[in-house]
């Protein structure tokens, strides 16, 4: 693999000039920068990750904390799309991705310890128990964090509009002629609370009176639990004509 010295010799410039061109420093002519970069591409030059980390104070390594209790993994119908988009954007910007977990080569460690061990530049947290002490520890640490569908006061978050989503779903059911609409929701999270709020808001706007027994506690991605709650709804004297599932 060619080195900075090889590139410098090929282009007839100093190693310092090559370094400036590859690191997009401003004090170098645009034509020289492009000539050096073209030579780097032609020669197959790749920067040394350790050297780049020392120079830029970045590892270009991002962590992903994804804990799916239902073990659907990367086939999760929602988060798989989120993580795939994240992967594409990260790769386009030259970042690698590390999945954060508890066990490294047989050694148990906290999420924060794993982040420090891998020297990640930041972490995306998705599909976890946000009240887990280890998650709270990570969020409150010096590691930059972005959370998905959960808000911590001092951290950046990317949110779905769960209120509007459920309202649209209820109104679509209403437009199809349904007036007895039930809702089996997931376990207690901020996402669930917003969806329940959207459900009741839509029902109120449509003038629908929803019996208390029409709103059931379920578990996300738990088919058996959903089937159990569905049977309970269908056993009611006046059963719903439409059921919204988690």
Predicted regions and their residues:
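Residues at secondary-structure transition points
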Residues: 2, 27, 31, 49, ...
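Short hydrophobic/charged patches on amphipathic alpha-helices used for structural packing
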Residues: 51, 111-112, 135, 170, ...
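Amphipathic helical "hinge" segments at domain boundaries
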Residues: 45-109, 200
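Short beta-strand-centered segments that line the small-molecule binding cleft or hinge
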Residues: 108-164
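N-terminal helix-turn-helix DNA-binding module of bacterial transcription factors
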Residues: 1-60
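Short hydrophobic segments within beta-strands
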Residues: 65, 100, 126, 183-184, ...
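Bacterial carbohydrate/catabolite-sensing allosteric modules
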Residues: 1, 10, 42, 85-93, ...
